[in-house]
UniProtKB/Swiss-Prot annotation:
The lineage of its organism: Bacteria, Pseudomonadati, Pseudomonadota, Gammaproteobacteria, Alteromonadales. The active site is at H177. One of its GO terms (molecular function) is L-malate dehydrogenase (NAD+) activity. Pfam families: Ldh_1_C (PF02866), Ldh_1_N (PF00056). It comes from the Bacteria. The gene is mdh. This is Malate dehydrogenase. Gene3D superfamilies: Lactate dehydrogenase/glycoside hydrolase, family 4, C-terminal (3.90.110.10), NAD(P)-binding Rossmann-like Domain (3.40.50.720).
Length: 311
C-alpha cells in the first residue's frame, strides 16, 4: 500500500504525514511531496519514528517521483486562510495548484484514489474532475473531496453540548465544505434531542468552525491540526476499503449521482474500487430540508467556477 501526500511540508501536510506514519499498516510506503525544499527533511524527521512504514520525501516543481505506484493520493497543497478571508478567497491561488498536481496524477497514477483537502473543496474537486476528464482517465468512484473535518467537529461539539462520550456520536454531514453548504444532520443523532435553538446555534458553529480557528490563531494560521486528523481518518478509511475491509463508510464530497448537485457530500461505502456505493443520507427534518434546498445555488455556483476554470 502506497500513500502519497502532496503539500506535505504545510501545516496540514506535516500533521497528516505524522499521523499516517503512526497509523498506516505495517509494510506500507508513505511518500511526501511539496514544492518547499524542507520536504525531504520532513521525511527524514518522520523516518526516526519506530513504525514499519517506509517514508520518502521529494521537493521541487515535479511531484511525479512521489506519485509512482501510489494507491492513495491526498492533496493538501495550497495557501491557507488568513483572518478576513473565506474559503473562496483561496480560489485564485489554489485552483492552479490543484490543476497542475492533478495533471501529474492523471499521467502517473490514474487509478489511485484521490482525496482533495485543498480549499475551496466545493470548487477544487470539480477542477480535479475536469482535468481527469480531459486526460481520459476520470473515474467518479476514485475522486473525493475530504469533508471529514465537518464530521469530526460535529461529533466533538455534539458530545460537548450533550455530555456524551464522543466515541458514541455518529452523524452525517451533507452538502459541501464551506459556510452554508455544510449541513450536519442533527435530527439523525441517536439518543439525543435538540431544541430548535440548539439546532440553529450548533449548525452555525459547525459551519463557522474554520473561521473560529483562523480568528483564534490571530493571523498565525488556520485549522491545520484538526484537519490533519480528519484527513488521516479519511485516508485510513480509503486504505481499509482497498484492503477489503467490510462496512467502511465515510461522508465525502463526491460525484455520486445526487439529485441535488453534480457534486454533493453524503455517506459512501468504500472498497477496492474507491466508492462501492453511494448511500442515502436518510430522513431529514424540516429545518434541514430547508437548509439543504437553500444552499444549492451556492454549491452549484462553486462547482461551475471549477468547471469553467479548466475549460
Amino acid at each position: 500500500m502506497k500513500v502519497a501526500v502532496l503539500g506535505a511540508a504545510g501545516g496540514i501536510g506535516q500533521a497528516l504525514a505524522l499521523l499516517l506514519k503512526t497509523q498506516l499498516p505495517a509494510g506500507s510506503k508513505l511518500s511526501l511531496y511539496d514544492i518547499a525544499p524542507v520536504t525531504p527533511g520532513v521525511a527524514v524527521d518522520l523516518s526516526h519514528i519506530p513504525t514499519a512504514v517506509e517514508i520518502k520525501g521529494f521537493a521541487g516543481e515535479d511531484p511525479t517521483p512521489a506519485l509512482v505506484g501510489a494507491d492513495v493520493v491526498l492533496i493538501s497543497a495550497g495557501v491557507a486562510r488568513k483572518p478576513g478571508m473565506d474559503r473562496s478567497d483561496l480560489f485564485n491561488i489554489n485552483a492552479g495548484i490543484v490543476r497542475n498536481l492533478i495533471e501529474k496524477v492523471a499521467v502517473t497514477c490514474p487509478k489511485a484514489l484521490v482525496g482533495i483537502i485543498t480549499n475551496p473543496v466545493n470548487t477544487t474537486v470539480a477542477i480535479a474532475a475536469e482535468v481527469m476528464k480531459k486526460a481520459g482517465v476520470y473515474d467518479k468512484n476514485r475522486l473525493f473531496g475530504v469533508t471529514t473535518l465537518d464530521v469530526i467537529r460535529s461529533e466533538t461539539f455534539i458530545a460537548e453540548l450533550k455530555g456524551l462520550n464522543v466515541a458514541d456520536v455518529k452523524i452525517n454531514v451533507i452538502g459541501g465544505h464551506s459556510g452554508v453548504t455544510i449541513l450536519p444532520l442533527l435530527s439523525q443523532v441517536e439518543g439525543v434531542t435538540f431544541s430548535d435553538e440548539e439546532v440553529a446555534s450548533l449548525t452555525k458553529r459547525i459551519q463557522n468552525a474554520g473561521t473560529e480557528v483562523v480568528e483564534a490563531k490571530a493571523g498565525g494560521g488556520s485549522a491545520t491540526l484538526s484537519m490533519g486528523q480528519a484527513a488521516c481518518r479519511f485516508g485510513m478509511s480509503l486504505v481499509r476499503g482497498l484492503q477489503g475491509e467490510a462496512n467502511v463508510v465515510e461522508c465525502a464530497y463526491v460525484d455520486g449521482g445526487s439529485e441535488h448537485a453534480e457534486f454533493f457530500a453524503q455517506p459512501v461505502l468504500l472498497g477496492k474500487n474507491g466508492i462501492e456505493k453511494v448511500l442515502p443520507y436518510g430522513e431529514v427534518s424540516a429545518f434541514e430540508a430547508n437548509a439543504r434546498d437553500s444552499m444549492l445555488d451556492t454549491l452549484k455556483g462553486d462547482i461551475k467556477l471549477g468547471v469553467d476554470f479548466v475549460k
